[in-house]
Amino acid sequence: MGINTSSAQSSGAASIARSSVNVKSGNRHLSSNKKSATSALEERASRPSILVTFLVLAGTILSLYIWPILSPDLFFANQRCSFKYKNKGSQRVVVEGKNGVVATEEETCSQIGVGILKAGGNAVDAAIASGICIGAVNSFSSGIGGGGFMLIRHPNGTAHSLNFRETAPAGASKNMFHGNSTLSQVGGLSVAVPGEIAGYERAWKMYGSLPWHKLFEPTIRLMRDGMPMPKELASRIRRPEFSYFKTHPDWSKIFAPEGVFLHVGEKFYRPALASTLEEIAKFGPEVFYTGKIAERLVKFVQQQGGILTMEDMANFSVVVEEPIYGNFYDREVITCGSPCSGEALILGLNVLSKVDLSEGTSILGCEMTDIGVHHLIETMKWMSAGRTVLADPTFYNNTDHVEQLLSLEYADEIRNNISNERTFDFTHYKAEYDFPNDHGTTHLSVIDKDNMAVGLTASINLMFGSQLLEPETGIILNDHMDDFASPGIVNAFGLSPSPYNFIAPGKRPQSSAVPTILVYNGEVEMVLGGSGGSRIVTAVLDTIIKKYKWGKSLLESVESPRFHHQLMPNIVYIDETVEIEVLRALEKFGHIVDLIPVQYPFSEIQAVFRTNGTLYGLSDSRKQAVAAAY
């Protein structure tokens, strides 16, 4: 993975072709007259109204005079000035407390976590209870039919990473899909062995303080008594690909009991799932992995063409290991290693730690400059290239690759290959292989009164996973077999899939998850992580850089326009709320930009932060999320 430095060092004399900047809406290019992102925003900006002007002035007054009074610690802590961007009008709620904070992607589930803390539970108890709730409510993201990762830091300073990522069944093989991506995404063959319940029990046995059954009771009641339909869930079930939910007997009884989808605020019920959770609460994970729940799941998956067996379920195990560590701005950074993507995050932080991101012309206020944003994007491209050699270390001895990604010398080498004047095509970044895009996911962050911290990232992969809902148990099964690479498929850039991530029995696919904890002067300062599949790593990097390098509040670090680049395709993705100066600046460097509409958010962050003895929580409004604290 050596780097050729000549192309970057000689770029000053190069003639740079200015790439056009395109705007897409979802998967569709906007105008047929090839209007650039810059011209589109210019046209939009040229039609101001008196109402808009009034609202902007009112918002400015509110932010400058009212918000600091309401929350002075959060507004001024480590903040030098304020970003310029268009308020997208969504709910932006920062919570604060002294005893505990829980940030999830659904307000009810955040409140359940705080309820557990109030009942004497700790951060691990709260994370498990909130995670169970998210899987039942936002069932398009996660659930007990999936898996994930949990990062825990004890108040005494010890930390553990729990890997309960799903595993490939014993009957799986690298050629099992024969190049048919549909088989890996929908139906029985797409289902990997679920790990979430095993992971929760292992964390609870290590650190939990409340009885096991207490962690399930709030969600059991919620699913029996009915949960008002949240905005995000109502939006997801109405996507065209799920229109059949209205007529399918297993799905319609939950989301369309009268033949039409429930509206926001109308109650939905999941009694079958409530009964399943009751059994797990009473009898423990054994009933899920070796008892009647396992029998039902195995029978159902096999009826749908899958290869899951009782032996696969019984043999699932959780991997408990040391996290990986880095340093950034005098903070200790803790995250999880492969098959997480923590190595890529540490690489990005190492690269940017020695870069003056205030160099250049200010484009978003403060010290956020054109050259600074360009360096952030270029670093993301190098991170993505580094991810192509990561995989389940149980099956692939990638110690040399991991050590290289974590080394400061490699970060120096990359820094020398980032030009202040231009971007490059994908060959410059030395990616060795293609990698599949993972999807979906949920993340939650918790800090309790004793400063125990937990970051939990869980997933069933694509929305509603394999789209298999086992009717007797109410469990929605994952499609994480799609996160493996399959041989014989060369991507549009001529790269073959990574052999390190090929399917093998018992193997766990590579993931983009990066639950992360930052420690300052021996105490947890921040816990964060994200959802959004392959865009998680860059979203976490983006948030940390804004908070520490650009001195932003927690609020603006999470809510301001987010940047993403995964090398392939060679496109910068940005929230459409970005100001026009940013597009002009990126066009100057040769970047191609895809503006992401507000209604199609591509990554979401849940973060909690401690400063001056006060805890703050913020759940990303891109997913209609709200945190809770007390």
From Swiss-Prot:
Induction or repression: Induced upon nitrogen starvation. Also induced by non-fermentable carbon sources such as glycerol, acetate and ethanol in a pap1-independent manner.
InterPro entries assigned to the protein according to its UniProt record, in alphabetical order: GGT_lsub_C (IPR043138), GGT_peptidase (IPR000101), GGT_ssub (IPR043137), Ntn_hydrolases_N (IPR029055)
Pathway entry: Sulfur metabolism; glutathione metabolism
Principal location class: endoplasmic reticulum
EC number: 3.4.19.13, 2.3.2.2
Any GO molecular function: glutathione hydrolase activity
Topological domain spans for side Cytoplasmic: 1-49
Catalysed reactions, semicolon-separated: an N-terminal (5-L-glutamyl)-[peptide] + an alpha-amino acid = 5-L-glutamyl amino acid + an N-terminal L-alpha-aminoacyl-[peptide]; glutathione + H2O = L-cysteinylglycine + L-glutamate; an S-substituted glutathione + H2O = an S-substituted L-cysteinylglycine + L-glutamate
Gene Ontology CC: endoplasmic reticulum; endoplasmic reticulum membrane; fungal-type vacuole; plasma membrane
Record-linked Pfam families: G_glu_transpept
Lumenal compartment segments: 71-630
Location relative to the cell: Endoplasmic reticulum membrane
Binding locations of L-glutamate: R165, S459, N461, D483, S511, S512, G532, G533
Gene Ontology biological process terms from the UniProt entry: cellular detoxification; glutathione catabolic process; proteolysis
Residues passing through the membrane, by range: 50-70
Post-translational modification: Cleaved by autocatalysis into a large and a small subunit.
Glycan attachment positions: N156, N180, N315, N397, N417, N612
Active site: T441 (nucleophile)
Oxidoreductase keyword on record: no
Family under the similarity heading: Belongs to the gamma-glutamyltransferase family.
Summary of subunit composition and partner proteins: Heterodimer composed of the light and heavy chains. The active site is located in the light chain.
NCBIfam families in alphabetical order: g_glut_trans (TIGR00066)
Protein function: Catalyzes the transfer of the gamma-glutamyl moiety of glutathione (GSH) and other gamma-glutamyl compounds to amino acids and peptides. Major GSH-degrading enzyme, catalyzing the hydrolytic release of L-glutamate from GSH.
Protein name from the UniProt record: Glutathione hydrolase proenzyme 1
Organism in which the protein naturally occurs: Schizosaccharomyces pombe (strain 972 / ATCC 24843) (Fission yeast)
Gene name linked to the record: ggt1
